[in-house]
Swiss-Prot record:
UniProt source species: Mesorhizobium japonicum (strain LMG 29417 / CECT 9101 / MAFF 303099)
Subcellular location: Cytoplasm
Function: Catalyzes the ferrous insertion into protoporphyrin IX.
UniProt record similarity statement: Belongs to the ferrochelatase family.
Cellular component, GO, one term: cytoplasm
Protein name: Ferrochelatase
Substrates-to-products reaction catalysed: heme b + 2 H(+) = protoporphyrin IX + Fe(2+)
Annotated PANTHER family: FERROCHELATASE, FERROCHELATASE, MITOCHONDRIAL
Length: 353
């Protein structure tokens, strides 16, 4: 017969405690919002650092390094930083000295933390795949705060190896350096989730109601990827087309009213079509006088939406004969946008909290 041994809970040392580390049984959950990335400034050096990291990612550029690196270092990184820096300067948040993407992603994190106030063991943070704050630094911070589980949320509604997959790659790469790695979950693509489609439709209707004209055509413009990536099995194009189909259905519009295009192509390789710039130009030349463009694939406004669409696409349309142009903002940290993020996070935290 064994006798019970009384243990003073106040005197008991938590299992796994090491100086400078949280107890093994801390049981906290980290929610990590991950966006693409941003340079730290618009000058040549920060732009060079950012573009080097971004364009060195084999998920983004699927060329042999022996072929790509001479092009990257010999041509791209000697010319593109200056041009890209000028583009960023036009949209730069001067008050906070940062890009809008960083401003909005931080705001999303802060608002999500507030919305999850009923879950005291959940910590919300945010990071970038490229640039700062880095995925590695924030993951390490969450672990140091006692998070033994991390829910990663790559902020891309439509999956692509060039975005969602590389965000997950980077997180696991960071965890490889940790002795004590947390359990990991990743929020799946949400391109067809009703809460996302409803948020998009609501945002579009709300912004169209503020215009003094009615667009004849509304374009859903998604960031493109090289066509060979899609041909090899990347589901991104199918996800984009399904988002537009569901959005069209929700808004009650036909295929001529709401169309799909792809933007931001880079290099001479064929990318997903139809191209946004070519479509906008053709609409203007064909006599269409009023259009609006929305970017469902971007969780927050950034260089590709504010400058490439808000400025370049508008100029292209006007030069081609168009009259009225509107760029509908991304969901950002709006009420609609935060509803989507909170809904996805709460669902994926099931069983953990």
């Amino acid at each position: 017969m064994t006798s019970a041994i009384a243990v003073d809970p106040k005197a008991a040392k938590p299992v796994g405690v090491t100086a400078g580390h949280a107890p093994a049984g801390a049981g906290k959950v980290g929610v990590l919002l991950v966006n693409l990335g941003t340079p730290d400034g618009t000058e040549f050096k920060p732009m060079w650092r950012y573009l080097r990291e971004f364009l060195s990612d084999p998920r983004v550029i699927e060329l042999n390094k022996a072929i790509w690196y001479p092009i990257l270092y010999g041509l791209v990184l000697t010319t593109r930083p200056k041009k890209s820096g000028a583009n960023y300067a036009r949209i730069w948040n001067q008050e906070r000295n940062e890009s809008p993407l960083r401003t909005y992603t931080r705001a999303q994190s802060e608002k999500l933390a507030e919305a999850l106030g009923d879950l005291p063991d959940v910590t919300v943070d945010w990071a970038m795949r490229y640039g700062n704050p880095s995925t590695a630094s924030v993951a390490e911070r969450l672990v140091a705060q006692g998070c033994d589980r991390i829910l990663s949320f790559p902020l891309y509604p439509q999956y692509s190896a060039t975005t969602t997959a590389t965000a997950n790659d980077q997180l696991f790469r960071a965890l490889m350096k940790l002795r004590r790695a947390p359990a990991i979950r990743s929020v799946p693509p949400y391109y067809a989730e009703p809460v996302y489609i409803e948020a998009l439709a609501s945002s579009i209707e709300r912004h169209l109601a503020t215009l003094d004209f009615e667009p004849e055509v509304v374009i859903t413009s998604y960031h493109g990827i090289p066509k060979p990536y899609s041909d090899k099995g990347d589901p991104y194009q199918a996800h984009c087309l399904e988002t537009t189909r569901l959005l069209r259905e929700k808004l009650g519009w036909d295929e001529k009213k709401l169309i799909t295009t792809f933007q931001s192509r880079f290099g001479a390789q064929e990318w997903l079509q139809p191209y946004t710039d070519k479509t906008v130009e053709k609409l203007g030349k064909d006599g269409v006088k009023s259009i609006a463009i929305v970017n469902p694939g971007f969780s927050v406004d950034c260089i590709e939406t504010l400058d490439e669409i808000g400025r370049e696409a508008a100029e292209t349309f006007h030069h081609a004969g168009g009259k009225n142009f509107a760029h509908i903002p991304c969901l950002n940290d709006s009420a609609e946008g935060m509803t989507v993020i909170e809904a996805m996070v709460r669902r994926e935290l099931s069983g953990w909290v």
